[in-house]
C-alpha cells in the first residue's frame, strides 16, 4: 500500500469489512516503531469517492475543477480524473501531471494570478486555453503569448477573512472590469466568463449574494462589447462538510436560477480543493524529544489544571518545513489523538507541540491538554490531506513521509457502480491481508 508524494507506482490495499482505518494505523505504527519511527500518512481513497458522490447529490449543477496544488499525489489525481472532475492548475508542472493522465485540455483551467510568460506559452502549446486574469498587465501578457486564450475575469469579493484588505489581494473591482473589457477588445483577447473566490473561513454567506450579483453585472457589461460569455467560476472555499455544502447551495441555488438560469448556455464551475482531500489523509508523527517546563511558561490557550503541575513541550519528527507547512500561513486548530491507550482517569497536562527544526516558527500546537507522553510515542493528526503532502523543505533533512493508500471493499464497489474503470488506476489495487490486530496487552517498546 506504500507510495510517496510524487510516486506514480503507488499501490492501494483493499480492506475487508472487518478492518478499519484505526487497524491500518496500528499496523504501520507497529512497523515504523520497529524500523525507524519515520512519520507517515494513511490515505483513504474511498473518502474521495464519497466526497464526489456528496457533491453530485448536493450541487450537481456545478462542475468541480479540482485545485491541484492542494494535493497533487498521483493517486488523488487519478481517482479524480476517473470520477470526471476538471482540474484547476497553477503551474506548468500541474498541467503536465493531469495531462499525463489523459485529461482533455478542455477540462483544465490555468488559474495562477501571476503567470510566467513561458508557462502561458506552454499552456498554448498543449491546448489549455481557459485561464483567469484580474489586471491589464496580465491581459497584455496573455495576448502576447496565447492567441487562443479564453479568459475568465477574476473579480474581487467582500470576503474580508484574513485581514482588513481581505480578498482584494487578487481580483479586480467591478468598476475596473469595464476598462479590462475595453483592453481585451483592443488586444483581441476573448473574454468568456467570470471567476470569484470566497474563503472557506467566511461564514457570511451573504457574500455570495453580492458576488453573484457582481458577476451578472460583468456578464451584461461584456455583452455590450460583443463578448460571448459562457462560464461562471465560483472558486473554492468548501470545507468538506455536507452541512457547509448544503448551506452554500441554499444561498446560491436560487440566485443561479435568477442570474444564470439553466438553458442560458452558461456553465457553472467551482474549484474545490481541501473539500475532496482533507479528510482522506491522516498523519502519524513520532515524539523525538521532550522537555518539562513550568506551567506558566506556556501560553494560556487552555485551562490550567493547577499552578504546581508541570507542563510539557514535545518535539515531533515532522513540522512546518514538512507536512505542517500550511501552519505558516494559517492557524491549525487541531488537537492530535494519542495513539497509545491510556486510562480515562489519567491526568492531563498543558502541552505544546513543536516540529524538529528548533525554529521559533516551527510550533504546531501552541497549547493543548494531553496525558504525559514519552519519547517514541505516536500522535495522530486527522484531516491532513490538504496542503500537507509536499516534498521536505531544504531547511529540513528529515525523510519525507511514506503514504499508505487504502480503500474499503464497500467503497471499491461504490466506485465500480459509479462506472470508474480506468485501467491505469485499477492496476494499482490489490487485496490487502488483514492488518495486525494489537490488543491492549501488546505493549511493545516505543523508547528511542
From Swiss-Prot:
Keywords associated with the record: Nucleus, Polyamine biosynthesis, Ubl conjugation
Any one of the GO BP annotations: estrous cycle
Family annotation (InterPro entries): Ala_racemase/Decarboxylase_C, Azin1, De-COase2_C, De-COase2_CS, De-COase2_N, Orn/DAP/Arg_de-COase, Orn_de-COase, PLP-binding_barrel
Entry comment on modification after translation: Ubiquitinated, leading to its proteasomal degradation; a process that is reduced in presence of antizyme OAZ1.
Record bears the keyword Nucleus: yes
Keyword Manganese carried by entry: no
Top-level taxon in the UniProt lineage: Eukaryota
Site (Not modified): 69
Tissue-by-tissue expression: Expressed in various tissues including liver, heart and kidney.
Gene Ontology CC terms: centrosome; cytoplasm; nucleus
Cellular location(s): Nucleus
A GO term, aspect molecular function: ornithine decarboxylase activity
Function: Antizyme inhibitor (AZI) protein that positively regulates ornithine decarboxylase (ODC) activity and polyamine uptake. AZI is an enzymatically inactive ODC homolog that counteracts the negative effect of ODC antizymes (AZs) OAZ1, OAZ2 and OAZ3 on ODC activity by competing with ODC for antizyme-binding. Inhibits antizyme-dependent ODC degradation and releases ODC monomers from their inactive complex with antizymes, leading to formation of the catalytically active ODC homodimer and restoring polyamine production.
Complex formation: Monomer. Interacts with OAZ1 and OAZ3; this interaction disrupts the interaction between the antizyme and ODC1.
Similarity-based family: Belongs to the Orn/Lys/Arg decarboxylase class-II family. ODC antizyme inhibitor subfamily.
Protein name: Antizyme inhibitor 1
Organism name: Rattus norvegicus
